Amino acid sequence: MSIEYYEVDDVDRVIKIVKEVLERFEFIEIAVLFGSILRRNFIRDIDVGLVVDREISFKEFNEVASTLEQTLNIPVDLVILNDAPPLIRFKALVEGIKIIVRDRKKLFYIISVSFMELKDMKEKLRILGIEETHT
């Protein structure tokens, strides 16, 4: 099995395309571009995080992912941040490029909740005597 890499030399173009595709889906409240595309030009996939206003079906998830992949011609790792672990959710929303934000208050609320969940986990690990790992 070989790993295929894709060159992305115009992140602004990717942002524009992702925004055009995702704006069609009304259930998407927040969309961010995060991960390796923010740090390098050669990538295996494009990480797109979504906050949705309701539970979405497998069919809807696949429709979003496949539309992005077909439009970009690059594999897309679509992450529903509502269900993601707190660290991934926090890093994506804080460090990622915001593409769609329909409700800024909700964005800040989710970031705050994620931060508090991380602090709670850190405290639980400290109480249990488990070393903290750095990511």
Residue ranges of predicted features:
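Catalytic core of pol beta-like nucleotidyltransferases
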Residues: 1-30, 38-42, 53-135
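Short beta-strand->loop micro-motif that forms the acidic, two-metal-ion catalytic signature
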Residues: 48-51
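Conserved loop-to-beta-strand segment in the C-terminal subdomain of adenylate-forming
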Residues: 44-46
